[in-house]
Amino acid sequence: MNRGIWTCLVSLAMLASLAATALAETAGGPHREYPRDRARERSWRSGFEGRTYLRVHGGISLPSGDFSNAVNTGLGLGASLGYGIGRNTILSGGVAYHRFGEDFADGHVSVVPVTAAVDYGFSSGGRVRPWISGGLGLYHLSETVVVSPTVEATDRENDVGFNLGFGIALPTSGRNAWGVGFKYHHISGDTFPDTNFLTLQAGLSYPL
């Protein structure tokens, strides 16, 4: 089993562990509840409709398939602006940046997705809110290789791609929330055929 698959399995286990811990805390029995906590819970459960959210996120990016044979695990960060079109549904547009080091050359591959997405948050009786997401958009891919101390060679391409994901979210203060999520990205291109990678990220959501 290659490194990418192992990393993927470990990442999924981490996400499952976080979800289980949060669920256990939610169902852990009676606890003292303050007025501020009750107000936060009411706001959290009232839904997304008519609200605008700014979300920022960052974490690890895991190459998959043939892509994992050429590059190493990288890092990613991004931001999105979303609007609640329903009680449980958010329509958003976002941009992100992912950078992967190369195995066999002194260089790196970067991926910049500019995507639109639909997120659906499942209602729950506790503080934990599971969600699923699907997105589509333009992915800018770039490979830079250092040929000599003064020369770099770069290939660039813009391709259409999609992403699918899931995760959990928890309220912090007011309508703010933090969460963790796992996403799969697939990009089809010519210079970069069938580029696949996974992301495990943590993020914060702020109402505007």
Language-model-detected regions and their locations in the chain:
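Gram-negative (and chloroplast) outer-membrane scaffold detector with strong preference
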Residues: 44, 75, 80-149, 159-162, ...
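Transmembrane beta-strand segments that form the barrel wall of outer-membrane beta-barrel proteins
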Residues: 54-66, 91-101, 136-138, 178-188
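Hydrophobic membrane-targeting alpha-helices
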Residues: 16-22, 121
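Bacterial N-terminal signal peptides
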Residues: 9-17
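Extracellular carbohydrate recognition
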Residues: 195-197
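Extracellular loop and loop/strand-boundary signature of outer-membrane beta-barrel proteins
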Residues: 64-67, 102-106, 148-154, 187-191
